[in-house]
Amino acid sequence: REIMVTQYRVAENSAVINTLIAAAQNGKKVTVFVELKARFDEENNLATAEMMQAAGIKIIYSIPGLKVHAKVALVRRRGQNGEKLPSYAYISTGNFNEKTATLYADCGLFTCRKEIVNDLYNLFRTLQGKEDPKFTTLLVARFNLIPELNRLIDREIELADQGKGGRIILKMNALQDPAMINRLYNASEHGVQIDLIVRGICCLIPGQSYSRNIRVTRIVDSFLEHARIWYFGNNHHPKVFMGSPDWMRRNLYRRIEAVTPILDPDLRASLIEMLNIQLADNQKACWVDAQLQNVFKKRTPGTPSVQLAISSA
C-alpha cells in the first residue's frame, strides 16, 4: 500500500533506490524524504531524487535550516479486500547505503510493534508539515529526545544516591555537547558508573575528580564502528536504545534524529552482550586517558584475545 523512507546518503546506482522505483511502478504509494544538505552527497541525492520523481515517487525535499539525519522507513499494508494488515517500521543507526554497509558496523530494528509504527508514521507526517508531533515511544531530536535523556540520567543518579548502583553505557561516534557532558560529570559525582565507547571526537575528560567514575574506551578495527547504542541500568531492569544521533550539539538540537527503545527482551540482551564484548576487548580497544590520549589495553601474558575467544566459540 505505502512505503515511506528517509534518504540521507545512498550509494551510486543504489539497489535501494531501484527497489523503491520498482515498488512505485508496481502501484505502491512511495514517499521519500531527501536530505539535500548531506555533506559531499548533495549532487548524488539530487540526481536520485529527480530519478525517483520521474518514476512517480513523491519526493519531499530538505527543511530549510534543518537537517533530517534519521535513518527510518515505514511500510503500511492493506489486503486485497482493503483490510488492514500489520505495518512495519525500521529504525537504524546507519544509512540505506549498500556501499558503506560493507565497511560500517551498524544496527537496525525491524518491527511491527504498533507503538513504534504509530510514532514513525507521526514523524513522517511531521516531515510533510501535516502533524503536530506527539511521540509516545520513539525519542526524536528537537522534540522529546533531550527531556527523555535527562530523565534517564536523573534516574541513574537517584539509584546511585539510594545505594542501588546507577549504571550507564553509551556507545556513539562522537561526544561533544557541553550540556550532556556536564550531565555525565554530575552523574559520576553522584557515583553512577559510566562506560563510554566513543570512536571519534570525545570532549569529555576522564580521570578527573568530577569524572572518576567515567571510563572511555575507543575501538578502531576492521569495520568502522558507527552504531549508537545507549544502556541505562534502571535498577536491574535495563533500558536500551539505539538510533541515529551522536551526542553533538548539531545532532541533538539542529537535526531531526530518531531513537527507538529496544522492547524485545532477546534483542535487548543481544545489544547488551555486544556492549559488554566491546568493553572487554583486549586486542583493538584502548582507553582514553586524562590527557585525551589513546592508551592501548595491555593483555596479561597468557591471557587469550577476547576477539579470538569469541570467533572460536
Spell out what each predicted region is.
Residues 1, 128-138, 163-165:
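Gly-rich Lys/Arg/Thr-decorated short loops/hinges at beta-loop-alpha junctions or inter-strand turns
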Residues 113-133, 147-148:
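Short, compositionally biased "basic patch" segments
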Residues 1-7, 148-152:
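Pre-Walker A segment
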Residues 102-105:
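Acidic/polar active-site rim loop that often engages polyanionic ligands
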Residues 7-13, 173-177:
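Short, glycine-rich nucleotide/cofactor-binding loops
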Residues 15-22, 180-184:
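A short acidic, amphipathic alpha-helical/loop segment
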Residues 26-100, 110, 115-117, 142-313:
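PLD/PLD-like phosphodiesterase catalytic module centered on the HKD motif
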Residues 5, 13-15, 19-20, 163-165:
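Active-site-proximal segment of RNA-dependent polymerases
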